[in-house]
């Protein structure tokens, strides 16, 4: 059994670590609230844009934008959104597992894959994994802006415009609640038709486009893709802070359990030392 001094040193070390994890838990909780507010503020715009675009996909337009046309998939692209920092449990690895499963399915069908990665964790993972990373972006911080994402999104849109991509997906963790963060893969292009059954049943009208459908749709569809990627980034950020808060709380609780166990070992070691000293004193007295 380790000596009392050594055990006391271990207890002190674990307590120091516990203070750090507790502080990180509190910081993550504070950032989580701010990121949830940001996510909630941008979600109505993204949801409305998705509904409008879904309606367009159902409509009979005199101008058919290439983003509305389904074509044979020979090459697909993924925009993968991860965190820049770790210590957030299995958030990133669960996301990577999901996208790798999807990539494997495409590869088995002979389809080539291009990747645009957002976040240093995705950059490191897919560069190591061997994916064809054609664009990367990291260091967005806790207040990402749409302007910081336009370059990365633009690379994928350009390849799609040139016919070098036939499908485009965005991959991110979706915030369900503080206990559930779900990795999702959503199709951006070609434009998925609305899944709203009520809209399908009542789709007896269409928008009137002024001045012309082409310039309006050209701008609107690009804005749609950008808005969905931005929403993915802010949702993933909220998921990151929640996951880190939970991970740090678990670490803090585990540290408390370890301290309790070490305290018991320390008490036993101290009791053993006292018993031994008493035995030596009694033995010495008997000898005299």
Curated annotation (Swiss-Prot):
A single cellular component GO annotation: proton-transporting ATP synthase complex
- Molecular function, one GO term: ATP binding
Compartment list: Cell inner membrane
Entry keyword set: ATP synthesis, Cell inner membrane, Cell membrane, CF(1), Hydrogen ion transport, Ion transport, Membrane, Transport
Biological process GO terms, please?
Answer: proton motive force-driven plasma membrane ATP synthesis
InterPro entries linked: ATP_synth_F1_ATPase_gsu (IPR035968), ATP_synth_F1_gsu (IPR000131), ATP_synth_F1_gsu_CS (IPR023632)
Q: Does the keyword Magnesium apply?
A: no
Which Pfam family is an annotated match for this chain, by its short name? ATP-synt
What membrane topology term does the record carry? Answer: Peripheral membrane protein
Described function: Produces ATP from ADP in the presence of a proton gradient across the membrane. The gamma chain is believed to be important in regulating ATPase activity and the flow of protons through the CF(0) complex.
Subunit and interaction comment: F-type ATPases have 2 components, CF(1) - the catalytic core - and CF(0) - the membrane proton channel. CF(1) has five subunits: alpha(3), beta(3), gamma(1), delta(1), epsilon(1). CF(0) has three main subunits: a, b and c.
The family database entries (HAMAP family) matched by this protein are listed as:
ATP_synth_gamma_bact
Q: Which family does it belong to?
A: Belongs to the ATPase gamma chain family.
- What protein is this chain from? ATP synthase gamma chain
């Amino acid at each position: 059994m380790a000596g009392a001094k050594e055990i006391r040193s271990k207890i002190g070390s674990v307590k120091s670590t516990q203070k750090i994890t507790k502080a990180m838990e509190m910081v993550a909780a504070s950032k989580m609230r701010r990121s949830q507010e940001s996510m909630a503020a941008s979600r109505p715009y993204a949801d409305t844009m998705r509904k409008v675009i879904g309606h367009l996909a159902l409509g009979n337009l005199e101008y058919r934008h290439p983003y509305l046309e389904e074509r044979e998939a020979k090459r697909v692209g993924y925009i993968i959104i991860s965190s820049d920092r770790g210590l957030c449990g299995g958030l990133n690895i669960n996301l990577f597992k999901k996208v790798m499963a999807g990539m494997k399915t495409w590869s088995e069908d002979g389809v080539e894959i291009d990747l645009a990665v957002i976040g240093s964790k995705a950059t490191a993972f897919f560069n190591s994994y061997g994916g064809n990373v054609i664009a990367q972006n990291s260091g967005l911080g806790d207040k990402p802006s749409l302007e910081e994402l336009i370059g990365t999104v633009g690379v994928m849109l350009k390849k799609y415009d040139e016919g070098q991509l036939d499908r485009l997906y965005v991959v991110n963790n979706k915030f369900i609640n503080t206990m559930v963060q779900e990795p999702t893969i959503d199709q951006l292009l070609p434009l998925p038709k609305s899944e709203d059954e009520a809209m399908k049943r009542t789709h007896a009208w269409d928008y009137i486009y002024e001045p012309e459908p082409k310039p309006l749709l050209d701008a609107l569809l690009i804005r749609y893709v950008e808005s969905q990627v931005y929403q993915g980034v802010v949702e993933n950020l909220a998921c990151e802070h929640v996951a880190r808060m939970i991970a740090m709380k678990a670490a803090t609780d585990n540290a408390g359990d370890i301290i309790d166990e070490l305290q018991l070992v320390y008490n036993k070691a101290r009791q053993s030392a006292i018993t031994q000293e008493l035995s030596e004193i009694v033995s010495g007295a008997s000898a005299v």
